Amino acid sequence: MISLRLYAKQGFHSDLKEAYLRVNKLILVLSFVLLSSNGLAVQKVIYPSMENIRETRFQDLFEILEQALDITRPDFGDYELSPTPFPMTESRMLQEVKSGKIIDVIWSSTSPKKEEELRPIRIPLRKGILGYRISFIHKEHQIIFDQVNTVDDLKKFHVGQGIGWGDIDVYKHNNIPVSYAPYTTLFSLIGPRRFNLFPRGVNEIYKEYAVHGESNPTLTIEDGIVLYYPWPYYFFTSKENEKLAIRLEAGLARMIKDGSFEAIFNKYNADAIRKAELGKRRLITLENPFIPAETPLNRSELWFKPALDSLN
């Protein structure tokens, strides 16, 4: 009797141990399956925070970035998107993304130097609309700009730009004088003491006026001229972060195919395009020799094309 009880007790513990091992094995298998289905570990993606907390001029690019990462979850896994803990100038951002230590991705205009030092994702994020420029001017100077019709006319004026902006080289190449200062101070410097006009992308100027107009009562939007020079804006990663670059390329391609890329463009730009009335403005084209040969200018679906025939 005692031996039977002992056997039963031992058998019970043996069965319990076997069940425990089976459960552990099942947990390991499930963990492996879950890891496999999620791709790999969570991909951390750090982008630069804005110079001014009130700024919304890059909200569309953030939305594109987030959507490109979302749409590629099935193939590349989950991600964690976060800004840097402190703002940076464009020059600093370029340095940091190159090193890959603080920033993983930036958005910026392109140039041969940037494409040599960084890894470009060659899809123009705003369809090149930044190449169409309307200017902030002093409110008393519209009568002066009514007489401006050519690049030679522009050479009489100083253009304002942010520190480290690639546009500086474009204006210098066209022999237009340039002054530069931190972005947040540019709106208060327009006038005879510093510079005469501050060209902004069609998609930027109305939003910026809503933010900075009230605190700068002499600021106004010039109403007769549109400048143009090819100016694509890309995502850039470090050359070593090929995994993120490939993921962003895949995500943007899918967004173009499913229409979400165009939807974001229209969401953020349609109102500004309507307000700008580009067909009623005098078109002044500037040379931009700093566009890399690899720029996909032949892919018409990637570019914003206003009714240029209606421009004077």
How would you describe each model-predicted region?
Residues Q43-F58, Q147-G164, N196-L197:
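Short loop->beta-strand "edge-of-pocket" segments that line small-molecule binding or catalytic clefts
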Residues V105-E117, F198-T218:
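A ligand-binding cleft/hinge motif common to bilobed small-molecule-binding domains
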Residues S49-E51, F58, G128-I134, H138, ...:
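Periplasmic-binding protein-like
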